[in-house]
Amino acid sequence: MTVGILGLGLIGGSLARAYKLAGHTVYVKNRDQQMLSFAMLSGAVDGKLEGETVPQCDLLLLAIYPDGCVDWLEENAKLISKDALVIDCCGIKERVCSRCFPLAKEYGFTFVGGHPMAGSQFSGFKYSRASLFQGAPMVLVPPVYDDMALLQRVKDALEPCGFGSFSVTTAKDHDRMIAFTSQMPHILSNAFIKSPTALRHKGFSAGSYKDLTRVAWLNPQMWAELFLENRDNVLFELDYYIDSLKQYQQAIRDKDMDKLVQLLDEGKKRKEEVDG
């Protein structure tokens, strides 16, 4: 299989390594040409994804910012083989899929929205690894929800990544859920670490601090774009969370033991309900 990858960051680089390890031919387009040259010299990439190689690709994986993915697809759609499968790896789906599904229909190739639920607090090719996706969930947004043949084709194409599970959803539901499960934790972590007390945490912090602050180390440009593209869903979760925090704040301010125990017990029971 010939695989084309757009972007050589953590996700794109890990995809390249996984497919190369599985014996496939890998072409990559990357803004940083020096990094692309390094990847080629290191054997992680076979060559550049460009006008001559795009038509050769059986699978195209788009692993840059949402607008960049759509812009590239609009510019190169006419070069893509009608037998090719194109999957994006962006953290939002409505904006991407609403523009890419019509493109695929117009030019005859197949586009499926994708979101690999794997990552790291670090970004860039130097942190990429072939095993990044091993056992991780993959969310799929197909153009037709119940096309089992297409879903099997996608699973087969992604086999070298080693995903542990596949979830199929709509673009709207994806963005609603991802605001809660991914985007909100990044906001909370990033805001929490700004406390002036954080400067003196060493010697006083353990697992809970590490868990809460891990994703504060993020890519500001990328996450800002994701938050704004998913603005309504993120604001819904933020408003709910802020209201909830105010209840804890008021109970502590009022020294209201009963209310505080009630709030904590509600949270404990909700965790048991959703993850028990």
Region locations from a protein language model:
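Internal alpha-helical scaffold of NAD(P)-dependent oxidoreductase catalytic cores
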Residues: 130-214
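Short phosphate-binding/catalytic loops that engage adenosine nucleotides
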Residues: 24, 44, 109, 163-164
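N-terminal Rossmann-like NAD(P) cofactor-binding module of classical short-chain dehydrogenase/reductase
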Residues: 60-61, 87
